[in-house]
Amino acid sequence: MKFLLLILTLWVTSSGADPLKENDMLFAENYLENFYGLKVERIPMTKMKTNRNFIEEKVQEMQQFLGLNVTGQLDTSTLEMMHKPRCGVPDVYHFKTMPGRPVWRKHYITYRIKNYTPDMKREDVEYAIQKAFQVWSDVTPLKFRKITTGKADIMILFASGAHGDYGAFDGRGGVIAHAFGPGPGIGGDTHFDEDEIWSKSYKGTNLFLVAVHELGHALGLDHSNDPKAIMFPTYGYIDLNTFHLSADDIRGIQSLYGGPEQHQPMPKPDNPEPTACDHNLKFDAVTTVGNKIFFFKDSFFWWKIPKSSTTSVRLISSLWPTLPSGIEAAYEIGDRHQVFLFKGDKFWLISHLRLQPNYPKSIHSLGFPDFVKKIDAAVFNPSLRKTYFFVDNLYWRYDERREVMDAGYPKLITKHFPGIGPKIDAVFYFQRYYYFFQGPNQLEYDTFSSRVTKKLKSNSWFDC
């Protein structure tokens, strides 16, 4: 260590760069060793120039790869880049995929979350990981399935310090995660530094964004030198509402696995486009989706931004080609970016506007008795974390935290929702109010006072 520190000191002095503190030089040495393959031979002082040249080349290599001004000197911008949180996988391979192009020789891949960070709720960890896998399955033919016991292809672990592989974590900051390329044993395994503060938002370190990056490695991708790519080595928060893979990420992963399986051609609509201002207009289902409200009717849906004149009508198949027409119920869990759609005895999950794999599922998996064949309407209450399902003159209540139907249900709609009678066509929640749709009319229902506060036409949202 002292020998290499001496070389770094002499090199910085001879290069004309500003003098560096000893801890900066030690940090730079460690960084170049870990990520750029710096190795300095113990040679006589007379040949030390060779080592200085080698160090300068490694600094230049790092600067070029990370898009810095290539000077070969440990200047301020270079040290700042070195101090950014990053992935623990080296940058030395100048390929979009790992050396030898390791890939999974199958399209159905299992994963298991061995333990959970205490920084986040268990369901939020599972959702972030599932969503990260979905990013890659959307652009490849790969399918991912979570298992809870045994050995999975990709084992996911939260750990601190040394944890049984080649790379001990270094505490908060620095290396935040690493992963291994496809293969047996440790191949594909993905590790997150527990000393980081993991989150589902911009605070701390966003688990979803880091997981997308690390799972790229687990699928065979190496680091990219494109700053817009999720496979760029350093971490930076990206707005989750606008996040998408870069062209470089997609080219890399599709060079290994090809593109996604092709869907059937978009079917023609079964019904003509409905008229928004028809006074007899009835909706099949209504739900919020982010900052919009979606109104479903036959093969179409309108989306509307509240308190805005912006309204648009589209075919359901234009957004989700494999979904059927005639959606009968819908609800959103906004903080999870999840929308559930129902038709007959089946339901589908939409996440970030993407149809999720392994759906549709049976409504009976939610706990409905066998006599329930369809759902008329559904709505999620974000304050209670409960979803209400309406069927004829009855309703059920589902606990979204525990993922189980509450005991003591069904109950009569008229008894517990004063002023609301069966049968309900659609319902959604917006700013403390439920909006119940029955035929061409809707009722505004105050969840605080448990009473109907307004009677409106169903299409009043369209400024008709």
From Swiss-Prot:
CDD domains: HX, ZnMc_MMP. Ca(2+) 2 binds at D153, G185, G187, D189. The lineage of its organism: Eukaryota, Metazoa, Chordata, Craniata, Vertebrata. This is Macrophage metalloelastase. One of its GO terms (molecular function) is metalloendopeptidase activity. The gene is MMP12. Hemopexin repeats lie at residues 274-323, 324-370, 372-420, 421-464. Gene3D superfamilies: Collagenase (Catalytic Domain), Hemopexin-like domain. Ca(2+) 4 binds at D284, E328, D376, D425.
